[in-house]
Swiss-Prot record:
Keywords tagged on the record: Cytoplasm, DNA-binding, Transcription, Transcription regulation
Protein family: Belongs to the TACO1 family. YeeN subfamily.
Cross-referenced SUPFAM superfamilies: YebC-like (SSF75625)
Pfam (any one): Transcrip_reg
High-level lineage: Bacteria, Bacillati, Bacillota, Bacilli, Lactobacillales
Domain of life, per lineage: Bacteria
InterPro entries: Integrase-like_N, TACO1_YebC-like_2nd/3rd_dom, TACO1_YebC_N, Transcrip_reg_TACO1-like, Transcrip_reg_TACO1-like_dom3, Transcrip_reg_TACO1_YeeN, YebC-like
The keyword Cytoplasm is annotated on this UniProt entry: yes
GO molecular function: DNA binding
Leader peptide range in chain numbering: none
Protein name: Probable transcriptional regulatory protein M6_Spy0297
Subcellular location: Cytoplasm
Biological process, per Gene Ontology: regulation of DNA-templated transcription
Length: 238
């Protein structure tokens, strides 16, 4: 699973990097985190978390600094979080998380993306109850038992630790993600491939042929929207 999460980040960065969409999206996240607290990541855990994620996605330092500088200014631009749930072909389910300065625009864009690409937007809660919110931490290593013990000693609410192909994947309670990251740092982990809050499907579906092609186009349409921050789904191997 660790390889899966690392591959997701790599694919998204490669796909979005050409148009700098990933930079813009992280810029908004960094701005919001800095605006809501101190603009210093050493004094603002939420800001440090976003910056770490941005670095994992290869966001340049100047983009990060620009977003923080903007938050230090007198701008009063307000962003609102949103969630849109829906369905794709053949049992596929999707959760879209947004961060926007114009809710009406975003809602219309997401609904259009669903409708024009073989999907249907559902009501709030129609999909999310079939997903579990968890913290996901991925880093190089192979001793899952040792990592599990370290996290327990640090009183981290850890669900599971997996080792695969030289990669450790840790699943924590969402409230303990930051605590888990710090515990691992305290035990010598210096570099993380993934540190994310994820919505993980309780079961997955396999799509093939036209269904898979339709689903991929739907996901691309949703992720290409500037206001969409994260897209979660239950399709295996994607």
């Amino acid at each position: 699973m660790g390889r899966k999460w690392a591959n997701i980040v790599a694919k998204k960065t490669a796909k979005d990097g050409a148009t700098s969409k990933v930079y813009a999206k992280f810029g908004v996240e960094i701005y919001v985190a800095a605006k809501q607290g101190e603009p210093d990541p050493e004094l603002n855990t939420a800001l440090k978390f976003v910056i770490d994620r941005a670095k994992q996605a290869q966001v340049p330092k100047h983009v990060i600094d620009k977003a923080i500088d903007k938050a230090k200014g007198n701008t009063d631009e307000t962003f609102v979080e949103g969630r849109y749930e829906g369905f794709g072909p053949n049992g596929s389910m999707i959760i879209v998380d947004t961060l926007t300065s114009n809710v009406n625009r975003t809602a219309a864009n997401v609904r259009t993306a669903y409708g024009k690409n073989g999907g249907n937007m559902g009501a709030s809660g129609s999909v999310s109850y079939l997903f579990d919110k968890k913290g996901v931490i991925v880093f190089a290593g192979d001793d899952a038992d040792s990592v599990f013990e370290q996290l327990l000693e640090a009183d981290v609410d850890v669900d599971d630790v997996e080792a695969e192909e030289g990669t450790i994947t840790v699943y924590t309670a969402p409230t303990d993600l930051h605590k888990g990251i710090q515990a691992l740092r305290d035990n010598g982990v210096e570099e993380f491939q993934v540190t994310e809050l994820e919505m993980i499907p309780q079961s997955e579906v396999v799509l093939e042929g036209d269904d898979l092609e339709t689903f991929e186009k739907l996901i691309d349409a949703l992720e290409s929207d500037d206001d969409v921050q994260k897209v979660y789904h239950n399709v295996a191997d994607l």
